A protein has these predicted regions:
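Alpha/beta-hydrolase-fold serine-hydrolase catalytic core, especially in secreted/extracellular enzymes
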Residues: 45, 58, 70, 83, ...
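Structured interaction patches on ligand/partner-binding surfaces of diverse proteins
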Residues: 172-197, 289, 296
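Asparagine-centered strand-capping/turn motif at beta-strand->loop junctions
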Residues: 124-130
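A flexible loop/linker signature enriched in serine peptidases of the S9 family
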Residues: 66-72, 223-234, 250-261, 276-316, ...
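Short glycine-/Asp-/Thr-/Trp-enriched loop segments that recur within the blades
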Residues: 45-47, 98, 210, 254-261, ...
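Serine-hydrolase catalytic core recognition
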Residues: 53, 347, 354, 360, ...
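Blade-terminus and WD-like Trp-Asp/Gly-His loop motifs, strongest in beta-propeller folds
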Residues: 54-60, 216-224, 263-272, 347-357, ...
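Predominantly five- to eight-bladed beta-propeller fold
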Residues: 81-102, 247-265, 275-333, 524-538, ...
Length: 807
């Protein structure tokens, strides 16, 4: 056995050396270098595309600086009321101070709640300098917390993330230490026990109203505190009271496995608070090895908390504390018996009247979602809202709400009619007052709510007839469903920025084949005040860069439109035939085909080698109707392949230069899983795949993402979706890439599919990247490997790389 292990290791090392030589043993001006030079050749060739308004204090005018040509720019002053525009070479010429004595855009105080999912890959590093453990949470698109585990005292945790992702750090009792938004350059946080100066706008919409900072555990009137000792809760009288320092036990049955703990949620009249009782469970730890640490010779072992599908989870119950009675009542969990939570945390919200508190119940398996209310006097629990689905409720993105305290109402997002829409509830009775938005289109994101005028502003998709249904448009509607108006016009994807007083908005719209147009419009009716800029891409086109081509074809059902793009090389010749390479990411949590204007360098550089690059969103992805989305339910192996293959074939019918005898595919993470799956289920169509950091068996991946789509308890759907289970059916040329330090997808997922391929006697290529995390194929080394591999097998099909072979 020892000899066999040695032989396999030698084969792997030999392969790694050979493929590295193949990848880099090229002249400095070879095809890959020439393709990558497109980045340099197209840089700085787009002008008048970026407008950053600096509003003057009266809120009726602003200025901006815009690039007009290489190394040239101009300053522009805009009178928002009249639409008059003045242009000059300096602020002084415009009669404005050189220093920015102006307020910044209101967009900065209306920062979107949802974490951006399309930011570039980067890293997050958390160093815990406190004497106790801290907890790290990702704040998802709707403001919900998702635990990424503890960081023990003195430890450091590093993980892969994306620019724009929002993270929350709490102490061991759950008290927030700070919210943090990840910049493209990465983020390093040191937990020192002090509250951070975080942006107050990065939080859920229901918490928009600012509060004065309070001492953790202390009641608003300062008379009482809650303290936890030996896993139990104590009520403490504070300084200045008649019984200063007196402690009264509230509970006595707390244990290490079933402790009472924070956070502590006081109501405003200081008569009641809520703490939590939690059922702790052993946390799964994933172990990875840093084979080549930068600070020592010997490898390092890294462990981190990581729940996987099917794991036992902690559970929390609210505990209602009465100051008058000095009592604690554990709230019955009859209406929330099996919550999905990775930490046992429950977010509590007290009503302004202090007579009840509310919290969410997300049933494990994600087929029931409730907002529950608890009476402060009796502890009785009632339903405010209940959603149910035979497939899944997308609790990350589609459980937005806004409490309307003055009228005791609640705005709520639901897909109950098959589309993501807003509903108005009577919060006191839990009854629907009316549907606010309706139609065969979706609410993508709520931007603001005006309680005084009883209207809501939101971005919608599919609301403009004839448009790509993924394009965002700004809309407004009254709470009672009347007065609906679409405020944007251009045929493209719209990004919105409001003026400080919210009477104007700047609309930036574009398409992949239409450069950005920036307009100033009135909030009242969307009327155009003036066009500010139209991006100039003349020099970009002179470089040879070609506009992507949009294309729509019917999906598997022969009825539903599938939207995608095609990208050609600069040297494109319609008389030639080109192999087709698909970039795939079919994760059900979003849609991923680019919609707005960008140079799209990853795709264009790859096309430059002599490929036609295609991207499309098939059924099972998000941001269309519920029926479209539900295709993914317990069928992640489907990944929209029937729709995208039909789309590619339809495109080729009118494009004879697409050679469908040479089709490749690549993707990372969920896209890596799909890329390999192409050679398992669709190897009659796809011939080559590059699969990076794939979640090749969903039982090995993070719990929240996989149970959302495959459900709980685990059943045969997990086996159907597993590339490991079906590795023996793989045919074609496969390159597997993984970063040895991936903390997003357990790298063992890739190693296990390697093992399965070896056992099945399959030939394939495998490259682990050392000291690299998630998204290894997007590193310079990984990117080049991908380019070289696709070139070899699609442009030079008779050449074969060294392969890992196993019998």
């Amino acid at each position: 056995m020892a000899d066999m292990r040695t032989l396999k290791l030698e084969l792997l090392v030999l392969f790694a050396a050979v493929i590295a030589v193949n990848a880099f043993a090229q002249d400095g001006d070879g095809p890959i270098e020439q393709a990558q030079s497109l980045i340099r050749r197209t840089e700085g060739k787009v002008f008048r595309d970026a407008v950053t308004p600096h509003w003057l204090r009266e809120g009726k005018s602003f200025w901006y600086r815009v690039s007009t040509a290489p190394d040239k720019h101009e300053f522009v002053h805009v009178d928002a009321v009249s639409g008059a525009v003045r242009r000059a070479g300096s602020l002084k010429e415009l009669g404005l101070p050189e220093e920015e004595a102006v307020s910044t855009s209101a967009q900065r105080s209306l920062k979107p709640l949802r974490t951006r999912v399309n930011g570039e890959a980067t890293t997050l590093r958390v160093r815990n300098s406190t004497a106790d453990s801290v907890e790290l949470y990702w704040v998802n698109q709707s403001g919900e917390r998702r635990s990424y585990g503890r960081v023990r005292a003195g430890d450091t945790k590093e993980l892969s993330t994306y620019a724009g992702h929002v993270w929350l750090l709490t102490d061991s009792l759950g008290s927030p230490l700070g919210f943090f938004e990840t910049p493209p350059t990465g983020l390093e946080i040191e937990a020192d026990g002090k509250p951070s100066q975080s942006d107050p706008d990065i939080k859920r919409e229901s918490e928009e109203k600012s509060e004065e900072p309070k001492q953790p555990g202390r009641s608003p009137d300062g008379k009482w505190s809650i303290r936890f000792e030996n896993h139990n809760a104590m009520l403490v009288t504070n300084e200045g009271t008649a019984k200063e320092g007196t402690s009264t036990p509230l509970t006595t049955d707390g244990t290490e496995l079933h402790p009472y703990r924070g956070p502590i949620f006081w109501n405003d009249n200081s008569k009641h608070c809520v703490v939590l009782r939690v059922k702790n469970v052993p946390r799964r730890e994933v172990t990875i090895v840093t084979s080549s640490p930068r600070d020592q010779l010997q490898p390092k072992l890294i462990k981190y908390d990581y729940f996987k599908p099917g794991d036992e989870l902690p559970q929390g119950q609210p505990v209602l504390v009465s100051v008058a009675d000095k009592s604690a009542k554990v709230i019955s969990n009859e209406l929330f018996p099996n919550p999905f939570t990775e930490s046992g945390h429950i977010d509590i919200r007290w009503s302004p009247r202090c007579d009840e508190f509310t919290f969410d119940y997300n049933q494990r398996g994600h087929q029931i979602y409730r907002i529950l209310a608890v009476n402060a006097a009796s502890g009785a629990v009632r339903k405010v809202i209940e959603e149910s689905s035979p497939t899944f409720i997308e609790w990350n993105d589609k459980t937005w709400r806004r409490w309307l305290d003055d009228t005791n109402e609640l705005l709520w997002m639901s897909e109950r009619d098959g589309w993501a829409h807003l509903w108005l509830y009577d919060a006191a009775t839990g009854s629907v007052k009316n549907q606010v938005t309706r139609g065969e289109w979706v609410v993508r994101r709520v931007l603001k709510v005006n309680e005084k005028d009883r209207c809501v502003w939101f971005l919608a998709g599919g609301v403009r007839s004839g448009d790509d249904p993924y394009y965002h448009h700004l809309c407004r509607v009254n709470f009672d469903g009347s007065g609906f108006i679409r405020l944007t016009e251009g045929d493209g994807d719209h990004a919105i920025e409001f003026s400080p007083h919210e009477d104007f908005f700047i609309d930036r719209w574009s398409r992949v084949d239409h450069p950005t147009v920036t307009e100033l419009r009135l909030c009242a009716d969307g009327r155009l005040v003036c066009q500010l800029e139209r991006a100039d891409i003349a020099l970009l086109l002179e470089s040879g860069w070609k506009l992507p081509e949009r294309f729509v074809a019917k999906g598997r059902d022969g009825k539903t439109g599938i939207h995608g793009i095609l990208i050609k090389p600069t040297h494109f010749d319609p008389q030639k035939k080109y192999p087709v390479v698909e970039e795939v990411y079919a994760g059900p949590h979003g849609s991923f085909t680019p919609k707005s204007f960008s140079r799209l360098m990853r795709q264009h550089v790859l096309a430059e080698l002599g490929f036609i690059i295609v991207q499309a969103d098939g059924m099972g992805t998000d941001e269309r109707g519920k029926q479209f989305h539900d295709v993914c339910w317990k069928r992640l192996e489907d990944a929209g392949f029937p729709d995208r293959i039909a789309w590619i074939k339809a495109a080729a019918e009118s494009r004879p230069w697409m050679d469908l005898t040479r089709v490749g595919i690549y993707g990372g993470s969920a896209g890596g899983q799909s890329a390999m799956r192409a050679l398992i289920d669709h190897h009659d169509f796809y011939k080559v795949a590059v699969a990076d950091c794939g979640c090749h068996d969903n039982r090995m991946d993070k719990i929240w993402w996989n149970e959302q789509w495959l459900g709980w308890p685990l059943n045969e759907s997990y086996l159907r979706s597993s590339n490991v289970e079906h590795a023996g059916r793989m045919h074609g040329n496969l390159l597997l890439i993984v970063g040895e330090l991936d903390t997003n997808v357990d790298p063992a997922s890739t190693m296990q599919v390697v093992n399965a391929l070896q056992k099945a006697g399959k030939s394939f290529d495998f490259m682990p990247l050392i000291n690299t995390g998630h998204g290894a194929a997007e590193t310079p080394y990984g990117t080049r490997l991908r380019m070289e591999y696709l070139t070899r097998h699609l442009l030079m099909p008779t050449s074969r790389s060294s392969q890992v072979r196993s019998n």
